[in-house]
Amino acid sequence: MSRIGKKPVQVPAGITATVDGQKVTAKGPKGELFFVANDEISLKLEDNAVVVTPLNQSKNARSKWGMSRTMIEGIFKGVKDGFERKLEINGVGYRAAMQGKNLQLALGFSHDVVYEPPVGITIAVPKPTEIVVSGINKQQVGQVAAEIREYRGPEPYKGKGVKYADERIVRKEGKKK
């Protein structure tokens, strides 16, 4: 039995949640999101909470049970507070700047890298060495942050590159003479 799945998801104050068959829709101050559950999962709205239950005890249904509950919790948090991911840039001459809606990165290439964020994602550059990716969809925020990091990931010798703010780089020692 899923310890995560059996807990009902409370609908926070200020959010309107509707359940229509396999689809949960949440409307809040930041926007609107929906989640469509697997056919083997049952969704009910009871006492201002969404109850997630598997329709049968198959391995597939049980594996989707906890994931569905977590996804519903994620859309509630997204439409209420939103998600953000911070990135840091280390290295001489490495910097970021906004160019309209696009992010312009100087990462040691012969050209500047220009990243156009998808719809629903906001990118901010508080300092030339900091990038903040924010939005209401947790998966999309993480995906955009990963794509930006991929342009020049941190290298293990000097730690140069783009890294997550909470990421710890395992450093290596250089060659010995």
From Swiss-Prot:
tRNA-binding as UniProt keyword: no
Record has Phosphoprotein as a keyword: no
Residues making up the signal peptide according to the UniProt record: none
Pfam families: Ribosomal_L6
Function: This protein binds to the 23S rRNA, and is important in its secondary structure. It is located near the subunit interface in the base of the L7/L12 stalk, and near the tRNA binding site of the peptidyltransferase center.
Family membership noted in the UniProt record: Belongs to the universal ribosomal protein uL6 family.
Quaternary structure and partners: Part of the 50S ribosomal subunit.
Protein name: Large ribosomal subunit protein uL6
Naturally occurring in which organism (per UniProt): Rhizobium etli (strain CIAT 652)
Upper lineage: Bacteria, Pseudomonadati, Pseudomonadota, Alphaproteobacteria, Hyphomicrobiales
